Amino acid sequence: MQKLVFFIFSIVLVFSFKNDKPAYIIYNSKGKKVSFFKMKKELKNKELIFFGEIHNNPIAHWLQLELTQELGKSKDLILGAEMFESDNQKGLNLYLNDSIDSKGLDTVVRLWSNYKTDYKPLVDYAKRNKLPFIATNIPRRFASMVYKKGGFEVLDSLSADEKLWVAPLPFPFDSEIPGYKAMLNMFPGHGGPEIVKAQASKDATMAHFILQNIESNHIFLHYNGSY
């Protein structure tokens, strides 16, 4: 299995554009401030980068595009995002291959409400540079099934074609993962375990499609919510 290296920097956003106050500050895993270009220098030798964004934050989305463009100057990229569901891959490919326009994309792909401002620049960058853009997330209706039924077993009822859009079943689940434990604390009582399992179905599917599409001598840059 290929060695996978992750995004190990934290970006603190500062909502001011005055000369003496930067719009963002980047820290490495040791808590040391680093410049954007220092971060880029370290990241360009990695195979897999997770960019954990703050949804709907303009600075975070601007940094996503800046980092993508900078890495693309010296490395071959594969892009992917949780904001696109796996059953929409064919429609996304049609747009990337110039078979449909933006209006056509809006009819065949379930786009987030902030797509035009926050994700279209990334998709269009991939389109201009003929890069793959992988729709990694599980279809939302399947995650909803897991939540409502309270278990992964409900995914066994999917058709053979539908199962191609999720991680191979059964997939491992560890409720002791810190992120899942924190989620349980956020949703105590009824519904908490179901929410965690629904999230786990998303995580497993995203991991599956990342591993399915990662290539040697490339960087797979994945956009997802901060974790």
Residue spans of the language-model regions?
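Membrane-embedded segments
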Residues: H55-W62, Q69-G80, S86-L96
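Bacterial Sec-dependent signal peptides at the C-terminal "C-region" and cleavage site
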Residues: K3, F7, I11-A23
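Solvent-exposed loop/turn segments at secondary-structure junctions
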Residues: I54-P58, F84-N88, P139-A143, S226-Y227
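Short hydrophobic beta-strand that contains or immediately precedes a catalytic carboxylate
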Residues: I49-G52, L221-N224
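Extracytoplasmic/secreted envelope proteins and their assembly/folding machinery
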Residues: F36, K40, H61-T68, Y119-V123, ...
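A substrate-binding/cap region within the structured catalytic cores of diverse enzymes
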Residues: I78, K90-E215
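Short, flexible loop segments at the rims of nucleotide/cofactor-binding pockets, characterized by
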Residues: I25-G31, H55-P58, R110-S113, V196-S201
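N- or domain-start disorder-to-order transition segments that initiate the globular core
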Residues: F17-K46
